[in-house]
Regions:
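Terminal targeting signals and extreme-terminal segments of soluble enzymes
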Residues: 1-233
Length: 233
């Protein structure tokens, strides 16, 4: 299933939300963390107005998430400048994932720091991460990643590298803030470059900050237009 299709499976039920996470979105014995966060964000959009751009998303992975997903979302506080919301993925009444989102309109600032693309890739440049069934994590089949600069994963680098990496999604829907969340978490940890062979690894907490105002990025699980999303780390 495409990400937009999984998001489209999110339906209201018993004061919360439910969705189905298929096997092709697994990361080991749990659902891919980026998908968990994207579903949580989609649920938060049920209680947070779409015109408030996402600023920060903080995720804590408490326990493995499998199969049917149940989500509870609520507003913690709606202030003049920002709105804080919380979403919990639950299983049998127990929290498996906790996500806090901060939303707010932009403000003028005397300190401006615009993110810049430090590398303009050529069409055939860089190393493309292969998807190897049985070896690669299942969710990786939905993303195509090309390393443009920095040491390769498992190359035995002596220090964490500075990566420039291009990520595209196989989704046929328009790029939404939910897609950005998934793409951001699909990027491998920088520490992998310091290893000499594949090894288990998992995140306990994860934070995403939106450095630019993307108020036009609204979750739209039913759209079908072709889009390509890119991310640079």
């Amino acid at each position: 299933m495409l990400l937009s299709e999984v998001l489209g499976s999110l339906v209201p039920r018993d004061g919360g939300w439910t969705a189905s996470a298929p096997d092709d979105w697994m990361q080991g014995r749990s659902v891919f963390g980026g998908l968990q966060a994207a579903l949580a964000l989609r649920a938060m959009r049920g209680v947070v107005p779409a015109e408030l751009p996402l600023r920060v998303l903080q995720t804590t992975f408490v326990a493995p998430v499998t199969g049917a997903v149940q989500i509870e979302a609520r507003v913690l506080r709606a202030g003049k400048g920002t709105t804080h919301a919380e979403a919990r993925l639950v299983d049998g009444g127990q929290t498996t994932t906790l996500v806090v989102g901060v939303f707010g309109r932009g403000r003028p600032s005397k300190a401006e720091l615009a993110p810049r693309l430090s590398h303009t890739p050529g069409a055939q440049e860089g190393f493309t991460f292969p998807f190897v069934p049985g070896l690669s994590v299942a969710f990786a089949q939905h993303y195509q990643m090309r390393l443009l600069s920095g040491a390769l994963p498992f190359s035995g680098a002596t220090a964490p590298p500075e990566w420039v990496i291009e990520v595209s999604s196989d989704d046929r829907g328009p790029t939404s803030e939910c897609h950005v969340v998934g793409i951001a978490d699909a990027i491998p940890p920088l520490a992998f470059a310091m290893l000499t062979q594949p090894a288990p690894g998992s995140s306990v907490t994860w934070t995403l900050e939106m450095l630019v105002d993307r108020s036009s990025l609204i979750c739209n699980p039913s759209a079908t237009e072709l889009a390509k999303a890119e991310s640079v780390q």
